[in-house]
């Protein structure tokens, strides 16, 4: 077997492409490699089974642990259900590919990207997105491509292309920009309160790089002698659209201009018009072409009626500057927000509502042991902030079985999570593991941004000292030829019938997250720039409403939340705290009824539902790890007797020896004549020898003049068993 090889030099790196060798029964395939990262991406098309008004596109991303030289855990020792990371990358592939296929095509298309080798310097996700375009092109599948994606990072004042995992972690920006020859089709970003202007410059920087990769794909097709197949829309029978335009335009326009209608009332009135139209068609003669068409295809009336409604709604926005609920283009829906709505057994809670979209968010404070371990190819080993988004069927007035979270729920949860991470306090300031759950109680657009707002409110209610509150809004777009209208705070029908869903989240200082999806084949940076700038006043307005509910963290935590103390010790003394076989740390936890976690860097976290117990454990550990100095006086307990002296525990786990000659001013024949095991004595540190051994004395020490660290008066310390 022979394949065709091509190398692309991009940003000083070599991207290697192999086509025609792997997966010969797929419509198209490519092995795309950079550094030691290798992905096999396939695109397969099968003929459509029945007419459809949506695109049956499936995008999958597979992570095999052998790609990182690892064997899966668990009894079966094989990969199970896809990890969250794989789901998010599958969505990252789907979102820029979907608008580049015509929905009328209807053929089933599946794109599968398999990560076969992973180099930590070369993240696989953007390679998978570009590989999806190449596999589709070489498979001669009709497609408005080529399409490519790049990641842009920001370190200091410099943008960098396709940063490594380490560079992403160090930087203030992680943005993926995907584009076609017509413009940008997808954006996914997390940022550290980056200004709007810097964000726009990063997008522009990324799209310039995207155009290079698009040109490379065009050159590849030319080298392979493949002519790209551009989708060609079949000629549409105008009989039914003309009939609907004549009979339904005015009734639909009247409904769209009734600005006081609720979503449900508007939907019912539109459905009534469609039902009446169906009755009129049924009364036509059997040989009438309109009746014949609708009889042959029951879905045709629904599809064409929806197209007419879409056309009229868009026309109203373009020509009149009015939306279906009467708002101006830049107007935000009515907002209400409240915090602390649930009993304090829930550590933090909030309800956020914007229009008919309503989200209940809750926050739970956990201990370090509650962190989520990551069993995937991401170099990060654990997550300490979790956001889970749930979208039950009742939120849209539907009934269906409630199952595990789908891709959409995972994606929305990840977006809201990314928006909050930049404002979370550091571990040493607030060492809790945090889990926020957002329950969508009612949906009419922008539930993910409602979850961002609800998350902020519930975190503050839980007492989390956020660096700044975060709000978010979804921006929309109507584009007809050269006429462009940007919409602020889109609702469901505007998302469904519009051209863009652009979610923008951030603080009053700058942006923390972006997510843009398109239904057209691309937009110039200038329009995206306008949308980002117009989102800012909306975000600030929403922030002000949120701060009316709660404007700072609660001063005290829920009485049902664990109490955590966090402090740092010398990493070289971690072994001292743990003790042989864990004896010392186990003794501390049993004695104080606490949980203790120690990180490799020396950060100690103590968890307890009793604050006093946590403080006691902290004192013990600080005593274990502090240095003892000559001349210090301690109150301690005699732990054992030997013929030449007695051992005294002066701090938890730290002993010194009193030589028999130092037990008294007078001569002592037997140690037991002065002290016995278990006696409390006051001793002074006489000497610390070259081996670190502590020599103590009772001579010249008044039994009522001692001190123990860190208290100013003697405090007996029982030995740890």
Swiss-Prot record:
Belongs to the polyribonucleotide nucleotidyltransferase family. It is found in: Cytoplasm. Its EC number is 2.7.7.8. The gene is pnp. The keyword Disulfide bond does not apply. Its cofactor is Mg(2+). This is Polyribonucleotide nucleotidyltransferase. Residues 701-721 are annotated as: Disordered. It comes from Prochlorococcus marinus (strain AS9601). GO terms for biological process: mRNA catabolic process; RNA processing. Transmembrane segments: none annotated. InterPro entries: ExoRNase_PH_dom1, ExoRNase_PH_dom2, ExoRNase_PH_dom2_sf, KH_dom, KH_dom_type_1, KH_dom_type_1_sf, NA-bd_OB-fold, PNPase.
